[in-house]
UniProtKB/Swiss-Prot annotation:
Organism: Polaromonas sp. (strain JS666 / ATCC BAA-500)
Principal cellular location given in the protein's record: membrane
Binding positions for Zn(2+) per the UniProt entry: C905, C907, C916, H917
Swiss-Prot/TrEMBL GO biological process terms: intracellular protein transmembrane transport; protein import; protein targeting; protein transport by the Sec complex
Protein's membrane topology: Peripheral membrane protein
NCBIfam families associated with the record: PRK12904.1, secA
Name used for this protein in its record: Protein translocase subunit SecA
Gene that this sequence comes from: secA
Enzyme Commission identifier(s): 7.4.2.8
Family: Belongs to the SecA family.
Keywords: ATP-binding, Cell inner membrane, Cell membrane, Cytoplasm, Membrane, Metal-binding, Nucleotide-binding, Protein transport, Translocase, Translocation, Transport, Zinc
Catalytic activity: ATP + H2O + cellular proteinSide 1 = ADP + phosphate + cellular proteinSide 2
Note on cofactor: May bind 1 zinc ion per subunit.
Amino acid sequence: MASNILTQIFGSRNDRLLKTYRKIVDRINALETQYEQLGDDELRAKTQEFKNRVAAGEALDAILPEAFAVVREGSKRVMKMRHFDVQMLGGISLHNGKISEMRTGEGKTLTATLPVYLNALTGKGVHVVTVNDYLASRDARWMGKLYNFLGLTVGINLPNMSREEKQAAYNADITYGTNNEYGFDYLRDNMVYEVGDRVQRGLNYAIVDEVDSILIDEARTPLIISGQAEDHTEMYLAMNKVVPLLTRQEGEADPRTGEGVTKPGDFTIDEKTRQVFLTEQGHESAERILFNLGLIAESATLYDPANISLMHHLYAALRANLLYHRDQHYVVQDGEVVIVDEFTGRLMSGRRWSDGLHQAVEAKEGVQIQAENQTLASITFQNYFRLYGKLAGMTGTADTEAYEFQEIYGLETTVIPPNRVSRRDDQLDRVYKTTREKYEAAIKDIRECYERGQPVLVGTTSIENSEIIDQLLEKEKLPHQVLNAKQHAREADIVAQAGRLKVITIATNMAGRGTDIVLGGNLEKLIEAVEADESMDTAAKEAEIARLRARWSEEHEQVKALGGLRIIATERHESRRIDNQLRGRSGRQGDPGSSRFYLSLDDPLMRIFAGDRVKAIMERLKMPDGEAIEAGIVTRSIESAQRKVEARNFDIRKQLLEYDDVANDQRKVIYQQRNDIMDAGSLQAQIESLREGCFTDLTRQYVPAESVEEQWDIAGLEKVLLEEWQISLPLAGELESATAITDEDILEKVIAAANVAFADKVEKIGQENFTQFERLVLLQSIDTHWREHLSALDYLRQGIHLRGYAQKQPKQEYKREAFELFGQLLDSVKNEVTKVLMTVKIQSGEQLEQAAEEMENRAESISNVTYTAPTETGEAETRVDEDTLRRVSLASGIAVPRVGRNDPCPCGSGKKYKLCHGRLN
């Protein structure tokens, strides 16, 4: 109460921020007349003037009013669009490292040009992050005209680009790309063996478009680069035979009494977490079946250490058969299982689920099973985006997640007022008893809209639902277009024309996101088609464009008079934000519009979270079939259920981050070491430190610290030095001749002998020649052990929750054991590098070159690289990418063709590659 009174007196934090920003907007507006008088060249020259002022030490905040005014004037000339004052507010918010919530149709893409231009003046690069490649390419081309006019360069960062193309994209003043691609480039840059192979040039400033989708929806799944592991095809096929022989338990057992089970069975399903659990009976049934299949011994159990992998495969088969359904979670095309994005309904070709789930689905569908993957590098979006010096974002729906943005990323949300107040009528939900009644009511609403000419957008949560609506509309003979994964190449064009008279569009959730639905259709698209028509002369084009404008204006007014775009949704999503995004497609820029959700008690969200309460209301009211509940209490009940799901998903993301923070600290150390090694001119200090550490550990095994002579094993130390390290050191003789010798004296002699042996080796070939070999050995050892460490952390993470049963804190145990594992990693690198460099037999520079080339070949040989990344569903999905293999240096597999240093140069000069184009590297 007191808080509300204070807010009314002083205004909210958001109100105070906007008040401050409006003063800056007044200063920008005051410059408009002055800049209108400038010629194009004079306006463009302002960019270099600003760059010089920034280089001289002037703050960006001081330049902001002038820079924003320049962008507005440039946009008026090039884009024929003038930034509204509210877009200026959004731009200031983005420059200050905040999230700008701007409603659909308010021009977020144009708003971003303001802070992008300002921050690009530093010359350190600006990254604009979009949700998909289509939007990255579209926005880069669209806004690139403005940036180029103002004298800035623009690059597009897409998957499967060559190293040179990516370097050019990152070296531009402004780079457009997807969140996944930026993250993968960061990981790949920390896997290369040559400084010149890196593509990124530092993480200065990023603006994330659809920030809620990228930093919230996709943050439950890390980015993973992996390589193929051992083949388990037979195991997946065998486990697929086990699942049909198991039965589902009905009812939940009370953990205290064991009561509550109505029908015993082998497994239970938790739909909330999408997990399957074997019961005690299920374990016994599975063990019996596996014994009959010859996969385990008669007395063996699934908990035996030798059978841990069987458990992994069995649970993957259970999830594949019981939780993942064809045409809802995936489709089968050309003998392959292709994942469907549950949020957008798009097909995610080339991507794969991880943890053996994809292979289990392949076994279930009877298609060819492809191999599992081993993690080579990994990072979460939370930790990747926190690497940027400054981060900002924009979306139409951030306020519901404002707490999470602040808690996880330290990002404040600023709600920007709309340019025109929304006139959309968001009607109360209608809840029916059955799915059939729900669809009948929705179809009736669609028919009424069609008969009066009002355009309709029907939103569904899956391809399956969109196909049901499709079939029902076909039956009713209502013309319509379906926008789902099976034709996503045309989705932007379909969405653009969804606001025309009598048009019915079925869309799976947010398919076509980023494209405005304009009432009367998208005039710009029609004009573009005319301008691209080479068969028409200029006069004919102008006449046709004038005709199109007149027809569009007439249709635009007709649609407005009919009530604008009608949104009809057939299901509530888990997140209120996704529902708000669907509603936001209507009523843009002050246009009229309306929305209605048609629900049933059979919908997943209702069934799991809110069904009982609503069902009780229906029964009390004795609702007849076909009648719906339409009341505020029902809508509030559903939103309460959504809040529960959102809170659970937030906890999942926060827990993921807490565990990944441990790995992130270690990742920073490893990547910093790699970069130091690659950038260093000399590695003598690092190699000497590793060597001393290695021989200290070795010596202390035979001559413990602060020990007396009787505890020493000098003979054993001499033997190991000679046999394993080829160092002949007569310590026993010196011990007899010396009057007094301590354990420290012995250690010094061993280290000195090792240093001499190493110096002799280097002297034969020359330190300069040896440095590159040292660099390769160090990098390969770090990479190999880091990959093994990632696997170890993954296994540790999967089983750490069991420590809770021993009254231990799982997170603390994870931190402690991860720290111990990291110590083992550093010891392994130290010992391996020292061993290789001390024992390798090299007598000449030519032999050194051969050894280095062999190591490079081993490093760059790889059978497959796969990239696992999340989509808006938060599910892990993987794509195979052969085109970037040459940029990623990994061990094991089939060699990728490359030119050896001593091979003839491909240019045809007849010289060796190292003496010709190899010098360029």
